[in-house]
């Protein structure tokens, strides 16, 4: 039968020191593991925060850059539109000045009576063809009545020669064209319901509408944005 010997105080002290050293070593190793893990987690979290901040900065910069681009585009578009409107306005002013100058010179055609009679003949004959009626009324300035009668006689003969139809034209003395008119005539048919305004002012307005595209092209060149032409 074995005997159990009691440990001496020295032996107990040694065992305690061994256990203490072991526990201390375990604690230090555990502490190192915890520190390493904490450092790793800190590094990961730090990297995540840096990445988030970087992304936020990049996003904010991209947003500001996009806003700056849009603002620049809007500014360019606004300036281009203002410039285009100024150019169009200047062009329209030039066209208006041209027609105003033409309007101011309309009355000069009546100064040469021979030339004016030729014009009246053409205007009256044109009205005869357009109306194609046997009886018509001509309105004119009182000062032009004699010239109009002569021109109407010539136009009636030409109309008869070309169409083999007679046309009787009388002057409406009760409704003359205002003396302030530059000249020309108004032919009335359809029992007073239809009229053709061949006064100089009306012809200039008609010319303005019909010749405007050609004048724009002649003065300002081809419009690259125009798809349809008159």
UniProtKB/Swiss-Prot annotation:
Its membrane topology: Peripheral membrane protein
Entry keyword annotation includes Transcription: no
Entry GO terms, CC: fungal-type vacuole membrane; membrane raft; vacuolar proton-transporting V-type ATPase, V1 domain
Pfam families named in the record: vATP-synt_E (PF01991)
Keyword Membrane included in the entry's annotation: yes
Cystine bridges: none
Family label: Belongs to the V-ATPase E subunit family.
Protein name: V-type proton ATPase subunit E
Gene (UniProt): vma-4
